[in-house]
Amino acid sequence: MKIKVLGSAAGGGFPQWNCYCRNCQGVRDGSIAATARTQSSIAVSDNGRDWVLCNASPDICHQIAANPELHQPGVLRGSAIGSIILTDSQIDHCTGLLNLREGCPHQVWCTPEVHADLTSGFPIFTMLQHWNGGLVHHAIQPARSFSVAVCPSLRFTAIPILSNAPPYSPFRGRPLPGHNIALMIEDTASGSRLLYAPGLGEPDAPLLELMSQADCLLIDGTLWQDNELANTGVGRNTGRDMGHLALGEERGLMTLLGELPAARKILIHINNTNPILDGSSDERLALTARGIEVSYDGMSIEL
């Protein structure tokens, strides 16, 4: 299995266009050991030629341009992306579908709850009906496995996770099980397993059991502290409000990851305020000491 990290930042990217916190200003002027990052999405493949896009970032066009693996030379118009899977209906994971309208129809896999959000409060499916067939919905049922034709050796299993519905959803603060899923992606040819969870509020016992079975974890690294936005002076929401378990809290995600046997533990969906973006920070060094990696745009992983 081949995995390509197309974007590694949380919503707004890094630096965020209107933010001048220490991190954002530091990456602009070079005063911290950091690199710019686009908003979170990955692509996976069983052969390195055909790809499944997992989440469609607002930066997807730039991400495709920056990753030749996703190009399809030799045709007048085309893409190596054959299917799209959405793990939630958050704006930073779905807006890129609008930017891909020239390639419609697209095969899009998501839960009924996500599809409902994307046909009502943020009606991308409805809008794109006017572009060559739009988005063809394939329903994901939580806790059930499925495959896609473009990568037949990959088996995807949707795992309901504790997080939150997006701010525009009527289910904000009271999400249903299908509003947020992790994906267990298994290469049936090699047996290797990736667990992808870019939005993770609280790992429960069933999820921790599945995380212990994965060879690689690609996990939500949004915040270091639960009250990080308030401490930085840029917002009031806590990580838990937004559906993210902070890394550095007591029994936070860093501690949990340190107890799991996966050969690789990699963070994705990193907010612009998170000190781990500075490669020389104490927080980054603490992760490194525990064998936890921080993903970056263009990162290639092979299992």
Curated annotation (Swiss-Prot):
Superkingdom, natural source: Bacteria
Gene3D superfamilies: Ribonuclease Z/Hydroxyacylglutathione hydrolase-like (3.60.15.10)
Protein's name in the database: Coenzyme PQQ synthesis protein B
Pathway: Cofactor biosynthesis; pyrroloquinoline quinone biosynthesis
Cross-referenced InterPro entries: Metallo-B-lactamas (IPR001279), PQQ_synth_PqqB (IPR011842), RibonucZ/Hydroxyglut_hydro (IPR036866)
Function text: May be involved in the transport of PQQ or its precursor to the periplasm.
Assigned protein family: Belongs to the PqqB family.
One record GO biological process: pyrroloquinoline quinone biosynthetic process
Swiss-Prot/TrEMBL keywords: PQQ biosynthesis, Transport
